[in-house]
Regions:
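Conserved donor-binding/catalytic core segment of Leloir-type glycosyltransferases
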Residues: 191, 239-255, 261-264
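Aromatic "clamp/platform" in nucleotide-sugar-dependent glycosyltransferases that forms part
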Residues: 317
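Nucleotide-activated donor-binding/catalytic signature segment of Leloir-type glycosyltransferases, i.e.
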Residues: 280-303
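Short alpha-helical donor nucleotide-sugar binding micro-motif in glycosyltransferases
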Residues: 304-309
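Conserved acidic donor-binding segment of nucleotide-sugar-dependent glycosyltransferases
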Residues: 349, 353-360, 369-374
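A short, well-ordered alpha-helix in the C-terminal region of glycosyltransferases
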Residues: 376-389, 395-401
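Short hydrophobic beta-strand element within catalytic cores of glycosyltransferases
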Residues: 334-337
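Short acidic/histidine- and often glycine-rich active-site loop of Leloir-type glycosyltransferases
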Residues: 284, 339-354
Length: 409
């Protein structure tokens, strides 16, 4: 008799789109290689996938949910029909493991989902890509140094950040609702993506839930030192004699754009600052001496930029475990990062430097130090670290090991 295949069902805001969607896609491929079936349920935005895809809700439902969230601060409490249909789909699939990623984003009703998870008693893994799971409102609180989430959220000072609320502050009740829902599932394992985030979880109402940190990985066969770099300099009019200081973000909010403007004033014109991922408004506001590039899906161009750079600078004010650090190091480029969240965890003494938040003068000094030493003194160590620690095949295989462990209990 043919053995029944194991089934993994993942839930995320996107499918094979953006960093978290691609993580879910990579995990799906790994379980398929081990004989499993893979399903991904998503809210919006997708690329073709090797997994079976299921769209949760619709564009219209998402807009209504988004409006309700802005008016009533009830993010995650709408989309009831969409969530009921998702539950029916999950009941049809009968997965052996359910893996949650970002369940926020105006597409899902989390009390309904967790009621189902509680009743179904299916082993559930939840990768925490941010802090939304244990706050009464926000996904990030580092920038304003808020610690209300450690005791009980109320009178939220962060209402104007995602998921933005224009009028109402429901943070006290949201905190209560999340606590009730998320602590109801006994067969739940939390997976923070950085040691820093694990320590935050341990100080929250989720402190007693099983937790295992698994760092994100990247495709080190794609992100590797590139050659023939003159073309990228020509494309963006970077002088051959200039050293390139690179910054990359998909969204520059709280990622240090103003810090780069300050850095430009501290460095002479022998350095070219290149920033990737800027919006149209940000591109228009750039001062002279900074080269701005819109968000790109062109990985080959990104690899060329990483490889061209003398150093990758990440003056982020809010982050958990930025993938861009890994990508730069894999391309043989040292990293200078602020001591923010889990960002320093990608770097060691041979591959970069960690600087206190806001100390842009020290960043400038370290750039000059790296130039004096020569990038070559870092490149081999960078590549070796990437091959040892950042390979996505190794990182995401840890999830498969976790699934097998949970099923065998």
């Amino acid at each position: 008799m043919k053995e029944k295949k194991r089934k993994l069902l993942q839930i995320n805001i996107t499918a094979n789109w953006g960093s978290h969607g691609k993580i879910a896609e990579s995990i799906g491929k790994i379980v398929q290689q081990n004989g499993w079936e893979s399903y991904i349920a998503y809210g919006r935005w997708m690329n073709p996938s090797q997994s079976e895809l299921y769209r949760i809700g619709s564009d219209w439902d998402e807009r209504i949910h988004g409006l309700g969230s802005r008016l009533l601060d009830n993010h995650g409490l709408m989309s009831k029909k969409a969530t009921q249909r998702l539950i029916e789909y999950m009941t049809h699939v009968q997965p052996d493991v359910i893996h949650l990623h970002n369940i926020h984003g105006y597409y899902l009703n989390y009390p309904m989902l967790f009621k189902y998870l509680e009743q179904a008693a299916i082993p559930t893994v939840w990768t925490l890509h941010d802090c939304w799971a244990f706050t009464g409102h926000c996904a990030h609180y580092m920038y304003i140094h808020c610690e209300k989430w450690k005791t009980h959220c109320e009178k939220c000072p962060n209402l104007q950040t995602y998921p933005k609320s224009w009028f109402k502050d429901r943070s006290y009740q949201n905190f209560e609702d999340k606590q009730k829902a998320f602590l109801s599932v006994k067969n739940l394992t939390l997976v923070p993506v950085s040691n820093w985030l694990e320590q935050q979880v341990k100080q929250s109402f989720l402190r007693h839930v099983n937790t295992l940190t698994i760092h994100n990985g990247i495709d080190t066969s794609l992100f590797c030192p590139a050659s023939h770099l003159s073309a990228i300099r020509q494309k963006y009019n970077i002088p051959d004699t200039n050293e390139v200081i690179l910054g990359v973000a998909s969204n520059w909010y709280h990622k240090g754009l103003t810090d780069f403007v300050q850095l430009r004033n501290l460095l002479n014109n022998n350095y070219s600052i290149v920033l990737v991922g800027l919006s149209t408004r940000e591109l228009k506001s750039l001062p002279q001496g900074i080269i701005g590039i819109p968000r790109t899906q062109n990985v080959a161009e990104l690899v060329s930029l990483y490889s061209t750079a003398l150093v990758y600078v990440n003056p982020t004010w809010e982050d958990n475990y930025p993938t861009t650090n890994l990508e730069a190091i894999a391309c043989g480029t040292p990293v200078i990062t602020y001591d923010t969240g889990g960002s320093p965890e990608a770097v060691d003494n041979h591959t970069g430097f960690v600087v206190p938040q806001g100390n842009i003068e020290q960043v400038a000094t370290l750039i000059q130090q790296i130039q004096h030493s020569g990038k070559d003194t870092f490149s081999a160590a960078c590549r070796a670290r990437a091959e040892k620690l950042f390979r996505k095949e190794d990182c995401f295989s840890e999830y498969y090991k976790l699934y097998e462990k949970l099923i065998s209990r």
